[in-house]
Amino acid sequence: MLKSKQNKINAFVRNASIPRISKESILGLKVSLPSVEVQKRIVKILDSFTELTAELTAELTARKKQYEFYRDSLLRPKEGIPMVELKDIATDIYRGFGIKRDQVTANGIPCVRYGEIYTTYNTWFDTCVSHTCLENVANPKYFEHGDILFAITGESVEDIAKSVAYVGHEKCLAGGDIVVLKHKQNPRYLAHVLATQQAREQKSKGKVKSKVVHSNVPSIEKIRIPLPPLDVQKRYADALDNFDAICSDLNIGLPAEIEARQKQYEYYRDLLLTFAETGSTLACKLQAASCKLQA
C-alpha cells in the first residue's frame, strides 16, 4: 500500500543535511482501506508477481554462475602450463590520460573512460562508444588492437582493476585511471583469464574498502596467470566465447521478462491500491488482474 504512495511520501521530505519526514506527515497520509477479505486478495495477486520476478532473477543469477564456473574450471592453473606474471609478457605498460565527462563528443577520436570498463564493456570489445577531440587531451595515450585495458579506480575491492581486451582496428585514446597492457599473446584469452576468480583475488589483494578503491601499475604487473601456447590460448578463447554467446542468447529474454513483470506488478499494485470503489466493483477488477497474471 505505502509503495503506491511513494511519490506523495517523497513530497513530505524536508531538505536538510539528513533528509527526513515528520511524524505528523506520515500519520496524516490517507490510504484506501478495503475490507480484510479484499486486502487478502490484493496481497495474493501482488505476491504472485513478486514471486515470479524473484524466480526469474534467480535463474539469471544461476546462468551467470554456471558460465563463471565453466570459465574458472577451464582456466585454472594446470600441471604443464607455466604461470607467468603480467610484467613478463608485457611489451609495454602505461597509464592513460584524463578525459572528462564533458569532453566526450558525438564524433572525433574513439576513446574509453575508466568507468565504461565497468558499465559498458564485457570481456572484449571492438568499437568504442565514446569519442573526444584531440585538443581536449594534453598528453594523449593510445591503445590499439589486442591491448588489454585495466580500470584502476573503482567503487569496490571485489571489482577493482576490471580488465577488457580491445579487438577493434581503430587507434583509440585511453582515459585517466586506465592502464594499457601491450603484449604478443591472444587478447581474448588474456581477457578471459583475467576475469577468473583466481585473477580477481590477486587484483583485490591488499586493497582497503573505502568510497573509492585504487590500484596501480606495479600491482597489475604482479598478477600471475597460466599461459599455454598461442594455439591453446585460441582454443580456450573460442570455447569461452561460444559458451558466453550461448548464455547471452539465453539471457537476453530474462532481463526483459523481469522488467516487464516488474512494470506489470507496479501497474496492478497502483491500480488495486488506489480504488475508492465498493468491494463488489473492486472484486471485478481483482478478477481481471488474476486472469492477466495467469495469461
Predicted regions and their residues:
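A short glycine-rich beta-alpha junction/loop motif
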Residues: L2, R14-P34, K171-D177, V208-P229
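Short, basic, low-complexity termini and linkers enriched in Ser/Thr/Gly/Pro
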Residues: K65, K285-A295
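Non-catalytic DNA-recognition/assembly elements of restriction-modification systems
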Residues: S73-G96, G253, E257-K263, Y268
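Structural preference for solvent-exposed beta-strand-turn elements
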Residues: S35, S73-P82, L271, S280, ...
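Short, solvent-exposed loop/turn positions at domain surfaces
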Residues: N15, G98-I99, N136-V137, V167, ...
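A short beta-sheet element
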Residues: M1-K3, R113, N139-Q197
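Amphipathic alpha-helical segments
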Residues: S25-K64, E68, E221-Q262, E266
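Sequence-specific dsDNA recognition surfaces
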Residues: D88-R101, E116-H145
